């Protein structure tokens, strides 16, 4: 392949198409997005924190192969690496990048779903990192998984997941989404809800370890364990969310104006996130995730919802006000003016009203 540039990311070096020669990353013959470096770094940390050695790791949509190569080089837990891409040019590049990093892998040139079905019951980790939606590959990912393991998926079709394209959202994810101030979290829970329902259909129970939003994508990593009876537990965390005049409610059946079906359970595991924070970068981001995961409410609040006289407290002030009122509150990574709280809307509103009234009386 012509017009390659040598790049470095994490602990590896690799060749990727030169975007300047192809008019951008989306026109290159093999896709590589440098904006996904954080995604790859966090996923590598997650594998390392997961802590089980000798893992069979499959990346069926490999592109340049950098994600899988980073897993092999940096995590210390990969026993066997399986890389695949439907593009012959990508496969050639994957082999080149494996060689310069001294990494062994099985490399395939197949349709991703065909390969996943061939790998039935043989993988510890399946990482779906497509251009667009992971939905077409989730069934195959579970079929490739052993009795237990990790399922990871990235979705860049965020506009679909947050309900901006209702028909496509219904077709692709089987959900109806209504716009809310916390639409980012709804989109993330929409993706998790879809994965949980597919998991149940394939007789797997899932436990999210890390889920987050980053600008142009959603990312989910979940532990999965096979067992039909346990798989039913997924539905204990599937529900609908209704938003009306600030009030948020969980509903266990669809009603007019509700969004769902969504995952309303935990978005991740604070313990594994704290482990990740101890061994790698993005510590501030990971701290926010760990704090968010400790609050069960499947939504967040935004400062403008509680503004009085055109003014609202700063985020730091808001969190302090709520904690002083006995309501546990933390920042959210999903909005710069957002916070999660374990209180109902009315309780949060009343805490702010008391704070504003007190502030006025001191003037």
UniProtKB/Swiss-Prot annotation:
Pfam families: TRM. One of its GO terms (molecular function) is tRNA (guanine(26)-N2)-dimethyltransferase activity. Residues 5-352 form the Trm1 methyltransferase domain. It comes from the Archaea. The keyword Mitochondrion does not apply. InterPro entries: SAM-dependent_MTases_sf, Trm1, TRM1_arc_bac, tRNA_met_Trm1_C. S-adenosyl-L-methionine binds at residues 40, 67, 85, 111-112. SUPFAM superfamilies: S-adenosyl-L-methionine-dependent methyltransferases. Keywords: Methyltransferase, RNA-binding, S-adenosyl-L-methionine, Transferase, tRNA processing, tRNA-binding. It catalyses: guanosine(26) in tRNA + 2 S-adenosyl-L-methionine = N(2)-dimethylguanosine(26) in tRNA + 2 S-adenosyl-L-homocysteine + 2 H(+). It is an enzyme of class 2 (transferase). Coiled coil: none annotated. Dimethylates a single guanine residue at position 26 of a number of tRNAs using S-adenosyl-L-methionine as donor of the methyl groups. Belongs to the class I-like SAM-binding methyltransferase superfamily. Trm1 family. This is tRNA (guanine(26)-N(2))-dimethyltransferase. It comes from Pyrobaculum aerophilum (strain ATCC 51768 / DSM 7523 / JCM 9630 / CIP 104966 / NBRC 100827 / IM2). The lineage of its organism: Archaea, Thermoproteota, Thermoprotei, Thermoproteales, Thermoproteaceae. The gene is trm1.
């Amino acid at each position: 392949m012509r017009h390659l540039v040598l790049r470095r990311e994490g602990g590896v070096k690799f060749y990727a198409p030169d975007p300047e020669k192809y008019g951008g990353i989306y026109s290159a013959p093999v896709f590589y997005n440098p904006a996904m470096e954080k995604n790859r770094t966090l996923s590598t940390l997650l594998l390392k924190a997961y802590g089980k050695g000798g893992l069979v790791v499959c990346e069926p949509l490999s592109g340049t192969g950098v994600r899988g190569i980073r897993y092999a080089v940096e995590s210390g837990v990969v026993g066997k690496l399986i890389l695949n891409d439907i593009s012959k040019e990508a496969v050639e590049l994957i082999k080149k990048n494996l060689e310069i990093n001294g990494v062994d892998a099985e490399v395939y040139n197949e349709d991703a779903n065909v390969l996943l079905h061939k790998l039935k019951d043989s993988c510890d980790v399946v990482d779906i990192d497509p251009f667009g939606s992971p939905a077409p590959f989730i069934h195959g990912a579970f079929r490739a998984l052993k009795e237990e393991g990790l399922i990871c998926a990235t979705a860049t079709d965020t506009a679909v997941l947050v309900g901006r394209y209702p028909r496509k959202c219904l077709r692709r994810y089987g959900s109806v989404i209504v716009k809310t101030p916390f639409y980012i979290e709804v989109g993330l829970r929409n993706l998790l809800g879809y994965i949980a329902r597919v998991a149940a259909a394939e007789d797997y129970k899932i436990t999210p370890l890390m889920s987050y939003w980053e600008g142009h994508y959603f990312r989910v990593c979940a532990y999965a364990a096979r067992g039909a009876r346990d798989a039913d537990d997924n539905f204990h965390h599937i529900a609908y969310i209704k938003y009306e005049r600030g009030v948020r409610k969980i509903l266990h059946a669809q009603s007019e104006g509700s969004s769902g079906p969504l995952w309303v359970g935990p978005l991740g595991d604070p313990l594994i996130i704290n482990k990740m924070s101890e061994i790698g970068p993005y510590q501030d981001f990971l701290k926010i995730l760990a704090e968010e995961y400790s609050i069960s409410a499947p939504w967040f609040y935004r400062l403008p919802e509680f503004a009085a006289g055109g003014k609202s407290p700063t985020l730091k002030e808001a969190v302090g006000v709520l904690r002083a009122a006995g309501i546990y509150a933390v920042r959210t990574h999903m909005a710069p003016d957002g916070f999660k709280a374990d209180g109902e809307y009315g309780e949060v509103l009343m805490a702010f009203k008391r704070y504003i009234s007190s502030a006025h009386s001191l003037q």
